[in-house]
A protein has these predicted regions:
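SH3-family beta-barrel domains
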Residues: 1-13, 26-30, 45, 50, ...
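Short alpha-helix capping/helix-loop boundary micro-motifs
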Residues: 18-24
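Catalytic cores of transferase enzymes with a strong primary signal for eukaryotic protein kinases
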Residues: 2-13, 17, 37, 59-62
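SH3/SH3-like beta-barrel superfamily modules
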Residues: 27-63
Length: 68
């Protein structure tokens, strides 16, 4: 089930897959609220990786706060 997260850093990398072993897309989230549609465990993030609804890629949930 999709959920929203808040990102408070400007330069959170978006990656092509769920882990630091996947390439960076060259894009960053910026600060704001984003919808996560899938979560997977992966290298480099204790909280897991979230797939952005926009289709842009995956972000580390270590740097995102889940919203109610």
């Amino acid at each position: 089930m999709p959920f929203k997260v808040k990102v408070d850093i400007l330069d959170l990398n978006i990656r092509t897959g769920a882990g630091t072993d996947y390439a960076k897309t060259g894009e960053h989230t910026g600060k704001g609220e984003f919808t996560i549609v899938e979560v997977k465990a992966g290298k480099g993030s204790a909280a897991g990786w979230g797939r952005l609804k926009s289709g842009a890629g995956w972000i580390s949930l270590d740097y995102a706060t889940r919203l109610a």
